């Protein structure tokens, strides 16, 4: 791994379960969820919260486990955070069986006790979770979908698959940590003297697919004051807060819904599905606003071989995200990612919104690898995608110009990406001198930090020099033509 790669990406943590989702819950805390499902493999189904702190030895962030909480029989496939205060929030999560579970999550101190943290902490986690966390068991049973995912994972981890690993291995990290004992001792690796308590508040069914009910998505909107669910049965659930009252189950699509997102104003909801449709819904009256047509704007490939495939290929919308335009919270755009089942390029489409009308503004190729995850920074400046091959790409949202690329950050497809807060305090944790930072997760059990370097500028001296040269050029030109 090159020095440049180390500066751009680093391994925050390696866990002992597949990770399916990640959320940033404060300027210095991230929450992950996942697990092995109901399969009797000994793999738990937990939430974990990590504290990010600045490490002066490596000039980047380090992650320390603050809380481990096992939810029981079912893996956490998706989640959303409903904040009450800085360290008090409700957590909606779900997956198999089409169930949604609501947890109250509260911050508290451990009586001031701080103990040394060890990398091999699975036994300590189980003991601490039984002492500090309140847990309620749920009797839910479904196994087929989890087993399918595990077969997919085993296929990717098989001996015939060769993976180029650009990240620090555990031995590399151990070697670096022992290079300078004094420096290592100056940054003690300790468990925080606080914890987050998880308390199950309620559970309810959101998906009613006849064969395999599966809640695939759960999203929260502050301005709409609602939580929205979607999954295998093609319906979108509108749940009013604070009591999670079901307002309606909208039959939005004929097939499984792959993604939904909510307009920052809380007026519109975008949904994309395996039925090939990208739809915009009015949240207030549950009516269809418009259908986005992508097929007409996808450019034809110039390669003859790809052109023959393109003729019969079908592009499906896979991901969608609303975003504010940088510097203007009243100006919103929508990004939609398109994948093809054939070996063709994937695309990112940008739609502008004017008076509730959607107009295609730009479309770019994101390479010939399917896109699996998407995130946008809170200031609207950057858009990130995670790919089937484990790659992470970041684009400038305004121009859709790629500004960061890290190949095979994970050994398998990316399941989740999340930008850290763009506040100064949060960026200082990763070493500063960056425009943004994001964290990616996968079923390869790894949490990886990516740092987006500041874009090069001329600076004051460079701008002054450019101005002087420009004036000199004008003078010489005018003198040459006797003007």
Predicted segments with their positions:
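WD40-repeat beta-propellers
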Residues: 42-44, 48-51, 100-105, 236-240, ...
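Beta-propeller domains
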Residues: 2-12, 33-69, 106-120, 158, ...
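C-terminal single-pass membrane-anchor helix
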Residues: 454-483
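Canonical WD40 repeat/beta-propeller blade segments in eukaryotic WD-repeat proteins
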Residues: 16-23, 74-83, 206-220, 255-261, ...
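Short C-terminal beta-strands that terminate individual repeats in beta-propeller domains
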Residues: 11-13, 68-70, 204-209, 247-252, ...
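Juxtamembrane amphipathic/hinge helix adjacent to a transmembrane helix
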Residues: 395-397, 405-458
